[in-house]
């Protein structure tokens, strides 16, 4: 009887920790979104720019940490697989779930600059990886793309601010900067910590229930490092912060390929793992599907969200065939 009671105790512990992790992720996403929106209004910066920079970088910390440590240990090929899977998840699941939660308006600048760049860096990674490895020179080139992206982003923002003649009265009612930054830090910590608890204990429960390691890896763990982006984008969409919801996912895509892989290659040139044609096709094609969904009515509704989620379901199905 003791092994049985030990099994039940362990399973209940995993369930409790999973619920705690879920609560931390949701609470962290709420605080992080409030902090990011407040910083945008306080500094008179658009939510799109905040989403593409601070929020995208903050929610991509799991990918950055995993990839950097993999490169330092000489397991760089793990980094590429992590980034490819994460970007497919970002485009299809995060934006799809956000559109299902609330209608998202798509600005022309988001369509023609951000979605196009997300598509472009995916193509660049594919072309760089055709020879089976990424060199330090290619890593430096990726970092250069990221630097150009940031420069153009803030240059366009400065131009927009010069065209504004009035300062919004809303800034008077915003929390002080130190409090907003505290929200950001606490939010990121809760997202990362809660995500770890959720993923680890969900994986343990899956093993208890006899789910195979491959299924755990392709579902729970693959989406695990993208949980912060998912929670933040869905919460932002429900709060009406469309630019923040889209900017977070697209910014993470750009950040993952240019900065994360760029840094990893500078630290340690890596070999590209045997990424299948299906993975490359969905990495690039997911951006095409998103662009088509967005350009038809310049907004993403439940229909478009369902299409994106359906594409991810098709991707998972193909992985098992």
Indicate where each model-derived feature is located:
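Hydrophobic alpha-helical segments, chiefly the membrane-spanning helices
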Residues: 2-321
């Amino acid at each position: 009887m003791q092994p049985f009671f030990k099994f039940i105790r362990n399973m209940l512990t995993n369930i409790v920790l999973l619920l705690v992790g879920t609560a931390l992720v949701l609470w962290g996403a709420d605080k992080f979104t409030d902090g990011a929106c407040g910083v945008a209004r306080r500094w008179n910066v658009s939510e799109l720019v905040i989403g593409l920079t601070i929020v995208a970088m903050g929610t991509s910390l799991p990918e950055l940490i995993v990839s950097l440590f993999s490169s330092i240990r000489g397991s760089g090929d793990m980094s590429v697989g992590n980034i490819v899977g994460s970007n497919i998840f970002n485009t299809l699941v995060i934006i799809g779930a956000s559109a299902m939660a609330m209608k998202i308006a798509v600005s022309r600048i988001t369509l023609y600059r951000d979605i196009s760049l997300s598509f472009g860096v995916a193509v660049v990674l594919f072309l760089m990886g055709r020879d089976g490895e990424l060199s330090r020179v290619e890593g430096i080139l990726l970092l250069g793309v990221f630097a150009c992206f940031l420069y153009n982003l803030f240059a366009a923002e400065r131009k927009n601010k010069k065209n504004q003649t009035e300062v919004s009265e809303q800034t008077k009612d915003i929390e002080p900067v130190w409090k907003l930054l505290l929200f950001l830090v606490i939010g990121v910590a809760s997202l990362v910590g809660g995500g770890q608890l959720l993923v680890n204990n969900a994986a343990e429960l899956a093993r208890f229930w006899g789910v195979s390691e491959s299924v755990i890896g392709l579902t729970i763990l693959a989406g695990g490092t993208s949980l912060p982006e998912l929670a933040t984008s869905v919460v932002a969409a429900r709060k009406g912060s469309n630019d923040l919801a889209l900017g977070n996912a697209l910014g993470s895509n750009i950040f993952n390929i240019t900065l994360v892989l760029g840094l990893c290659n500078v630290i340690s040139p890596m070999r590209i793992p045997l990424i299948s044609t299906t993975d490359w096709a969905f990495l690039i094609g997911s951006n095409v599907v998103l662009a088509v969904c967005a350009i038809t009515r310049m907004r993403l509704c439940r229909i478009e969200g369902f299409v994106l989620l359906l594409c991810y379901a098709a991707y998972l199905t193909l992985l098992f065939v």
